[in-house]
Amino acid sequence: MGVFAKGDVVIASLSYSDFSRRKRRPALVVATPKGLDPVLCLITSKMRGDEYDVLIKKTDFATGGLRRNSNARPCHLFSLDPRVIDYKAGTLKPEKIKEVTAKIVEMVT
C-alpha cells in the first residue's frame, strides 16, 4: 500500500487470534522501525474496560477518522507487512498518540 507513520490509523484484513477467519479491522501504527514492518495496535469498537484501553473519539483525529468511537488496545501489539494494509483511515492528533504510547510503556514496565 505505501509508507505509514506513527499515528496513522489503517484498515487491514486481520486474522482472529485462533486463525479461524479474517476480518477487516482498524489498527494504529505505533512504531515504524527502519527496514522492518510497522508495529500496530489493535483498535476495536467494543468497550471492554481493560485498564490499558485508550478511548479514540472522532475528535481525536487530525485527519480522516473512524465511523464510531473506538478503543486502542495496547495489549494487542503486532507487526504487519504493509502490503496487506488496505488503506489509511486517518491520523490521530499528537496528544492522543502520546496517550497510547504512554499506555504501552506503562504496560511493559
For the regions a language model picked out, list residue spans one by one.
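Short consensus segments that form the blades of beta-propeller domains
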Residues: D18-S20
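Compact nucleic-acid interaction/catalytic patches
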Residues: R22-K23, V29-A62
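C-terminal terminal-subdomain/extension
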Residues: G64-T109
